[in-house]
Amino acid sequence: MAREPGVFAISVVAEMVAMPAQNLRVYERHGLLEPDRTSGGTRRYSRADVERLHRIRELLAEGLNLAGIAHVLALEAEVDRLRTECARLRRR
């Protein structure tokens, strides 16, 4: 499935998720988030990025550190991938 292109500026997303823009930059540096970039290097966030930031905020509220969050997000992505694969195999 193709990823939706990013359209939101960092200031807009920071407001949408009630986080300082600096936090978004930190999450990107830690590999938790990978926004698109314009040709000039400006970050552009998609709706999927916004959803991921909401999930990051939930995990932070549960007491996880950034390494723990990265692990949880990776496991959730793997579960999604496996569910898709199972559904594909069932259709055979």
Predicted regions span which residues?
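Basic helix-turn-helix/winged-helix DNA-binding cores
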Residues: 1-61
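Long, leucine- and charge-enriched amphipathic alpha-helices
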Residues: 59-92
